[in-house]
Amino acid sequence: MTANPRGESFTETTVCENDNLEMIGLCHVGMYAKNPASLAEFYRDVMGMQIVDRSDVSHPAGASAFLSSRPREESHQIAMFSNPELAHRAFKVGSLAALKRFYQKIVGGGIRIKFEFLHGVSFAFYFEDPEGNMIEVFWPTGLKYPQPFAQKIDLTKTEEELMKELKALTGQKDFISRTNPNKALWEKSQSVL
């Protein structure tokens, strides 16, 4: 177990039983919610999911809620956002190398990358399908990290360079998270807003 700058512990999560798979499949959905807190309670009370993280309207990304039915295995399976532009479908790959290969496939196919982020819990990139629906492809880091969180990265860097960025993030004293919504620093780090 490792502690973040607030003294909270990171715990390892199960990443994937077969790390050789290019595309594991659909892993979570990010959906628009008028009131993420209220909708999260519905999914908790009716569907039995656990609320694993959230932010309120004061966060630069707006109000959000993250839920999982298996929080030890998946950091979240549903993400709810008050900002409709953050709605997406997320597909998991089995390794950082696979993420980089998939990234090159998308770029090589002439599809514009919208975002490249380190979320703490994952490395990810985003693009749109032909009808404008946002798609996320990600590789989970195996760490728990407060969400929402997005730090711009460059997926053309080597795996070693990207892992150094992850290591630097976990030791950073002034990170951006749901409990530290430093708007200026968030915007400086190329937020999704």
Model-identified regions with their sequence ranges:
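Vicinal oxygen chelate
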Residues: 1-20, 26-34, 80-107, 109-193
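Generic detection of intrinsically disordered/low-complexity segments and helix-coil linkers/edges
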Residues: 4, 22, 26, 36-37, ...
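Conserved short beta-strand elements that form part of the metal-binding/catalytic scaffold
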Residues: 6-7, 15, 50-87, 93, ...
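Residue-level detector of functional hotspots within protein domains
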Residues: 12-17, 22, 35, 64-66, ...
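Core segments of cupin and vicinal oxygen chelate
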Residues: 20-24, 30-74, 191-192
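Residue-level signal for secondary-structure boundary sites
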Residues: 75, 97-99, 145
